[in-house]
Every structure is written in C-alpha cells, then in structure tokens.
C-alpha cells in the first residue's frame, strides 16, 4: 500500500447549477473515505450564465475544501480544465466532468489502479446513457481521431482520469493554445493504463457538447497531433499527376499510331471540376494549419481568471 495522497478533483462547469448539489454531495462522501489529504475540489466556472457560480459560493462557505476558479468569460471546456490543473495543489489530480456522467464512485478504482505504479489512469467508457445517434457519433469520433493522430490515442477514453503531479506539470508546460488534453495526456508519456467505467446519465439538463463543439474538438485532436491531412494532399497530388501523365501518354499513342484523339468533353469538364474541388478542400486544410500557427504567434493567454475563492473566502 502506497503512502496517503493529497487529492485534487478538477471539475469544469458551464451552466450546471442543477447538477452541482448532488455532484458535490457524492464527491464529499468519496473524498471522506480516501485516506490522506487534505483533499480539495477545484471547481472552474467557465463563464456560466445561470446560478452555477452562486451555487458554488454557497457550497464553499460550508466546505473549505472547495476551491472556486471563476473565469472572466466562457473559454471552453479544455481551457477550463487547464485552469483547474493550474490551480490544483494535490500530488494526484482527478479530472472529471461536472454533469455527473463521470461517476464519482469510480475515483476509488482509478486510485487503486494508480497505486500499481501508473502516472495516468484513464476511464474507458464501456457504456453511455445517451441516444443511439449520439453514441454512434462518439464511437466514430474516437476512431477517426485515433486513426489520423500520430500519437497513439486510447479508444473511448474521455477526460475522466487520475494524473500524477509530474504529468500535470508536464501538461502545464506545453505552450500551445489549441489544447486537446486527451492527446496531451498520452503525448507526455509515463506509465499509463485504462479501466472500464460505465458512463451514467446526466444529473440534469442537456449536454453542452453539441455537434459543432464535437467537430471542433475533433479538429483539435487531428490538427494538433497529425500531419496526415497535409500528407494526404501531397499523395493525392502525386496520384493526380501520375494519372495525367498516363492520359497524356495514351493520347499521344492514339494520335501517332491510330490517328485518333480521345473524345469526351463532358468527362474532361467533370475531371476539372472534381480536381478543383479537391484543391479547394486541401487549401482549406492548409489554411487551418496556417490559422492555428497565427493563433499561437499572438501568444494570448489560454484563459483569464476573474477571481479565485479558497477556504470559502
């Protein structure tokens, strides 16, 4: 049995006022059963427009373990997690969503697995309490990102994980603005493993990850960890050149030896339109990479903090 740890639980929150009370109650019971400490809950309010912040402030007056990090506006889920990591002081840090779908009771299992010498133990989702369409979208999303990424990414592993202090410090040291924390968590290395965890239904409300947010997260995962789109553009260009040379050779052979010229004006126009579309598509991909480089050169902070509340004050 390893020495007792001081645990920090990082929770990004956006408009979760109804889910907060039962979630904090569950976490209170879970942390109370874990030896060591003092443990803390780092709740990051990502510019909520409902009473999430007021609910947190009321809870902090009753529970000094609750740390509130209030961001100046909505910076996004990944930025909110980074804010939590920056303010977490524990030697082990748990990252979990604030909607209750990551069951707090699974923290015991993550901690037990971590004691076998792992720096990262992530939850692999074996079931989801969502509609068939959303489950299919997530299944496809994980496999597309894992296939295109040059960093091996575990399938069906979300942000719910326990991280050692050296992993947290390594992630905090990465300078990029477009964060895909599931990828960064893998990229930093160190011993890692996953355990199966059933993802339960939301405590209340609807998911803040709509189709647009999911696409944006997928783009961050692909463009931050892969040059495959650029290489695909180059390979397609080589293939198009090879086909054009073959067609030119065939045309020359037909003219010299059979006094005939290939016909098919419609096919020619279709080929031109198709290749023009392909060029514009890959020009957009190149533009996405260039735009991300431009965003990085501005060196703006990933988030801005409005205020921090520790110990109820």
PLM feature spans:
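Structured catalytic core of nucleotide-sugar glycosyltransferases
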Residues: 1-132
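Hydrophobic helical membrane-anchoring modules
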Residues: 1-4, 180-313
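A generic fold-level signal
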Residues: 2-4, 36, 88, 155, ...
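Short conserved micro-motifs on helix faces and helix-strand junctions that flank
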Residues: 12, 71-73, 161, 234, ...
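Residues in soluble alpha-helical coiled-coils and helical-bundle/repeat scaffolds
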Residues: 14-18, 101, 172, 176, ...
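Conserved amphipathic alpha-helical interaction elements at protein-protein interfaces in regulatory
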Residues: 15, 29, 33, 58, ...
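Gly/Ser/Thr-rich helix-start
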Residues: 48, 77, 81-85, 99, ...
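Acceptor/aglycone-binding surface of glycosyltransferases and processive sugar-polymer synthases
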Residues: 69-73, 77-87, 101-184, 200-219
